Regions:
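Transmembrane helix segments
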Residues: 39-46, 159-201, 205
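Residues that define the loop-to-transmembrane-helix transition and helix capping
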Residues: 22-23, 56, 98, 166, ...
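Transmembrane helix-loop junctions in multipass membrane proteins, especially transporters and channels
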Residues: 40-49, 78, 85, 120, ...
Length: 238
């Protein structure tokens, strides 16, 4: 119980910092939203995905891109706390050591939820529609939370070990780029063989395919198990 209480206090501290500068949440949501608008209104007409509205195909990948962008801020916040000596100060106090990290992790989850909601609202305005029911939406939420949790624990590593702010955030760049080499924007069968092999065997593709299947009542096959395995595996390794 003490660990939970300590975590809730430190989570509240991190959330208050974010609420004082909500522009960080908005900024992280705006960049993926701008990419979504560009692909839908500039490139969407030239991309054949088998859907009536390209935003329906695109949305899962945009959400994953937003999550990857957002966790860079988690690494930066951790780095800032380390540089200011707050970690050492917390560890000298009678609080659970794990609660310091869990406070940041929970803040990442909540702030990502806010960003995702903003993105979905914009997608609805430009034509996104889903046939998913409550169970499917809850399943999508669960997968996104698990993916966010996995990447957040990855972000903890550079946050604690980086030598500069740029170093703390730089790890997220490859993660942001991964959706571009996946099924997030175009079907993988349109890609050259070497690229297709990579795209079909990296985590974003299985997660995107799972979310897309849940949102539009399409067959998922083994994608959901592969997606869960990736998320759990990344979390355990991190």
């Amino acid at each position: 119980m003490k660990a939970i209480r300590d975590t809730s206090i430190l989570f509240g501290r991190s959330m208050r910092h974010i609420m004082r500068s909500p522009d960080t949440i908005i900024t992280v949501a705006i960049i993926p939203i701008m990419i979504m608008l560009m692909f839908v209104y500039v490139l969407g007409g030239a991309i054949q995905t088998g859907t009536d509205n390209y935003v329906d195909y695109l949305l899962p990948g945009i959400i994953l891109m937003a999550i990857a962008s957002r966790i860079a801020y988690t690494a930066v916040r951790l780095f800032t706390d380390v540089q200011k000596g707050l970690f050492q100060r917390f560890h000298s106090m009678p609080i659970s050591r794990s609660s310091v990290l869990w406070g940041h992790v929970l803040t990442s989850l909540v702030s990502n939820v806010i960003s995702i909601v903003l993105i979905i609202l914009v997608a609805l305005l430009i034509g996104f529609r889903s046939s998913a029911g409550i169970v499917e939406w809850l399943s999508v939420a669960g997968i996104l939370l698990l993916f966010t949790l996995a990447l957040t624990w990855v972000a903890v590593i550079p946050g604690l070990t980086a030598k500069s702010v740029d170093g703390a955030s730089a790890f997220s760049y490859p993660l942001i780029f991964l959706p571009f080499i996946s099924s997030a924007f175009v079907p993988t069968d349109t890609m050259p063989t070497a690229v297709r092999v990579f795209a079909e065997n990296q985590p974003v593709t299985s997660i995107v395919n799972t979310i897309r299947g849940l949102l539009y009542s399409e067959p998922i096959g083994n994608d959901i198990w592969i997606a869960l395995a990736w998320c759990v595996g990344i979390t355990v390794v991190a």
